[in-house]
């Protein structure tokens, strides 16, 4: 059975997470220690800035999660707010993580690779094998379906996302566009980061050049003094104004003259309140002005898209979890059902042979009797097999039925049913 134990940004502080974080130099030895814990058959550890989560395959969930909890608390030297999940809930959580539904930023693309890397490390080290490999492949397939079939990857809601969305409506893709960001504060930084991520070339203008240079380094752009605004307006495709500027910097008369000489569109994004750019400037030909109200409308639309994307993702994940549960039930019930069918088939074969001894050798009769016996075995065991698979899924409520089947059919198969979920 799959179990998960760990903590993440939703229920644990940075201080809690950092004591469990696995540095690269000690990763292999710590992974080996966890793999050697009581009742742990296979193991994978995901360690990022937002989460430290252990996924394990085990035949004894209660013992495995207890040993994992004890090991993690011992590593921290204190009791940690660890979560614990069993079976389908552990798998559901893994798919949500891989789909970025559990990320600090919904839709962020890095998490899928991080999940794959975490499991691959364990596979390479020999502490994860068939069961966790199967879980990983299923989870990655489900997460890719979420990203392909929903708008999760497009559901950003930052100021930068809104600014880029409005600019793209006018100019098309931001790849290679020259974007001038006025200011070096938080609004400027968020806008610069997102536009950089869209492929734009960033120029930061700031009254205090050293602050502008710091932001420029962060986004891979260049910094210039605020006095260069006039020169930059002649070259820019997009200007994001996130700091006070000279009163005449964006005056309609100056912008009209600039527009005539440029002969191409320019998008002005005014993030200031009160506004730094006069509304009349937006009426000039080839000048497209957006203010915070325009950005707010884009962000609300993105939030609505995100809510719809999450709902779509949850539906897909529910389907994928259902497939996982059915596959797990089939896998775990298979030894019991196989033994039951083998015993029934052996009895049927004995009766066929006894009948043939009375009737004498006749290949056609033998063929018909064997076909009839096989059909009877399949039909008699169809319902019991289906109920046993369901009993394995039902956990404790189905344990009595599994035990009864073992007793009634005199089976020796060792099968442990699901012992329930823990959140």
UniProtKB/Swiss-Prot annotation:
Disulfide bonds: none annotated. One of its GO terms (biological process) is protoporphyrinogen IX biosynthetic process from glutamate. The record marks 93 as: Important for activity. NADP(+) binds at residues 183-188. Pathway: Porphyrin-containing compound metabolism; protoporphyrin-IX biosynthesis; 5-aminolevulinate from L-glutamyl-tRNA(Glu): step 1/2. It catalyses: (S)-4-amino-5-oxopentanoate + tRNA(Glu) + NADP(+) = L-glutamyl-tRNA(Glu) + NADPH + H(+). The keyword Oxidoreductase applies. During catalysis, the active site Cys acts as a nucleophile attacking the alpha-carbonyl group of tRNA-bound glutamate with the formation of a thioester intermediate between enzyme and glutamate, and the concomitant release of tRNA(Glu). The thioester intermediate is finally reduced by direct hydride transfer from NADPH, to form the product GSA. This is Glutamyl-tRNA reductase 2. It comes from Anaeromyxobacter sp. (strain Fw109-5). The lineage of its organism: Bacteria, Pseudomonadati, Myxococcota, Myxococcia, Myxococcales.
């Amino acid at each position: 059975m799959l179990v998960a134990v760990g903590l993440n940004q939703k229920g644990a502080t940075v201080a809690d997470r950092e004591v469990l974080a696995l540095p690269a130099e000690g990763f292999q030895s710590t992974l080996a220690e966890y793999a050697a814990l009581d009742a742990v058959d296979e193991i994978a550890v995901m360690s990022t800035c937002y989460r430290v989560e252990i996924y394990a395959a085990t035949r004894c969930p209660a013992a495995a999660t207890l040993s994992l909890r004890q090991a993690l608390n011992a590593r921290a030297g204190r009791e940690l707010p660890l979560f614990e999940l069993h079976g389908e809930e552990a798998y559901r959580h893994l798919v949500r993580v891989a789909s970025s539904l559990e990320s600090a930023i919904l839709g962020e693309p890095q998490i899928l690779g991080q999940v794959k890397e975490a499991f691959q490390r364990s596979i390479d080290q020999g502490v994860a094998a068939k069961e966790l490999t199967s879980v990983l492949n299923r989870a990655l397939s489900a997460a890719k379906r979420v990203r392909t079939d929903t708008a999760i990857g497009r559901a950003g809601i930052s100021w930068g996302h809104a600014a880029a969305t409005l600019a793209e409506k006018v100019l098309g893709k931001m790849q290679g566009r020259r974007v001038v960001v006025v200011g070096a504060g938080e609004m400027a930084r968020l806008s610069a980061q997102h536009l950089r991520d869209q492929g734009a070339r960033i120029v930061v203008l700031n009254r205090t050049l050293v602050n502008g240079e710091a932001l420029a380094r962060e986004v891979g752009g260049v910094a210039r003094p605020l006095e260069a605004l006039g020169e930059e307006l002649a070259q820019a495709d997009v200007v994001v104004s996130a700091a006070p500027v000279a009163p005449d910097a964006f005056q309609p008369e100056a912008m009209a003259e600039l527009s005539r000489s440029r002969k191409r569109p320019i998008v002005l994004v005014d993030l200031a309140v009160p506004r730094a750019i006069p509304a009349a400037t937006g009426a000039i030909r080839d000048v497209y002005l957006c203010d915070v109200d325009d950005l707010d409308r884009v962000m609300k639309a993105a939030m609505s898209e995100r809510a719809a994307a999450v709902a779509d993702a949850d539906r897909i994940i529910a389907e994928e979890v259902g497939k996982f549960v059915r596959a797990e039930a089939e896998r775990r019930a298979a030894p019991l059902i196989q033994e039951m069918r083998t015993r029934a088939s052996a009895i049927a074969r004995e009766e066929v042979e006894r009948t043939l001894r009375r009737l004498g050798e006749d290949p056609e009769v033998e063929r018909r009797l064997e076909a009839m016996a096989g059909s009877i075995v399949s039909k008699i065991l169809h319902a019991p097999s289906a109920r046993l698979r369901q009993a394995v899924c039902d956990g404790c409520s189905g344990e009595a039925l599994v035990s009864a089947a073992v007793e009634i059919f005199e089976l020796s198969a060792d099968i442990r049913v699901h012992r329930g979920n823990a959140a």
